[in-house]
Swiss-Prot record:
Belongs to the Antp homeobox family. Labial subfamily. The keyword Transcription regulation applies. This is Homeobox protein Hox-B1. It is found in: Nucleus. PROSITE patterns: HOMEOBOX_1, HOMEOBOX_2. The keyword Transcription applies. It comes from Mus musculus (Mouse).
Length: 297
């Protein structure tokens, strides 16, 4: 069985676990570091005693690493030589300490991170900026990014606000062509070419001359023919519809007066009484002043 291979972990002592770790001297092979100093600081073997006490007292047996095979190992180095300290030019000991004295000669492994953080210099402090070899940690998004975002937001806000402030003073409500069209156009008294006015048109105001000529024509003939209506309309500067409506209203007014008076309507001279009550549009009698064109059979 190769015992040298099994005990190879003793040939490479740990030099990066603390400021007071030990390594083998340069004039001796790597296995010259005593195993007593490597495990003296742990409570399992040395009970936390300093290494100087173990070296001065030769009565204590040399502690050996545990072995499942039950084989004892000799001491790899004589007790007359003191172990050499680790080179301080490398390792984490030059940046921070763990709060353990160098003369203790043992490893110090705290159970939590509180002691390690308490012993760190200013360069590793919470918020302090020191002159250590490493720069202080920076947040992922620093003040430069925040300032950049703020300046970009200000530019965007200025671009949005500048046109809005000038638009209300310059813009005027625009009127389109479809807005000019009236949904309910006002009624006008304009008569079409055929003489038919719009339904529900305005009331016609007749002049005194027009009323006198219409009353004179109604006295001689209550019912007019189409030709006579056209002639009277042309003479009085009216249309045929206006003359027709006036004669209808005048006949209704005459009948109302006769009903109120209780007398029989008298026909024009030279006409029989039967023809006076005829409600037909054609007239069976003629007046002396009537034109020949108004005579109908």
């Amino acid at each position: 069985m190769d015992y040298n291979r099994m005990s190879s972990f003793l040939e490479y002592p740990l030099c990066n676990r603390g400021p007071s770790a030990y390594s083998a001297p340069t004039s001796f092979p790597p296995c010259s570091a005593p195993a007593v100093d490597s495990y003296a600081g742990e409570s399992r073997y040395g009970g936390g005693l300093p290494s100087s006490a173990l070296q001065q007292n030769s009565g204590y047996p040399v502690q050996q690493p545990p072995s499942s095979l039950g084989v004892s190992f000799p001491s790899p180095a004589p007790s007359g030589y003191a172990p050499a300290a680790c080179n301080p030019s490398y390792g984490p000991s030059q940046y921070y300490s763990v709060g353990q004295s160098e003369g203790d000669g043992s490893y110090f492994h705290p159970s939590s991170y509180g002691a390690q953080l308490g012993g760190l210099p200013d360069s590793y402090g919470a918020g302090g900026v020191g002159s250590g070899p490493y720069p202080p940690p920076q947040p992922p998004y620093g003040t430069e990014q925040t300032a950049t975002f703020a300046s970009a937001y200000d530019l965007l806000s200025e671009d949005k606000e500048s046109p809005c402030s000038s638009e209300p003073s310059t813009l005027t409500p625009r009127t389109f062509d479809w807005m000019k069209v009236k949904r309910n156009p006002p009624k006008t008294a304009k008569v079409s070419e055929l003489g038919l006015g719009a339904p529900g048109g305005l009331r016609t105001n007749f002049t005194t001359r027009q009323l006198t000529e219409l009353e004179k024509e109604f006295h001689f003939n209550k019912y007019l023919s189409r030709a006579r209506r056209v002639e009277i309309a042309a003479t009085l500067e009216l249309n045929e519809t206006q003359v027709k409506i006036w004669f209808q209203n005048r006949r209704m007014k005459q009948k109302k007066r006769e009903r109120e008076g209780g007398r029989m309507p008298a026909g024009p001279p030279g006409c029989p009484k039967e023809a006076a009550g005829d409600a037909s549009d054609q007239s069976a009698c003629t007046s002396p002043e009537a034109s020949p064109s108004s005579i109908t059979s």
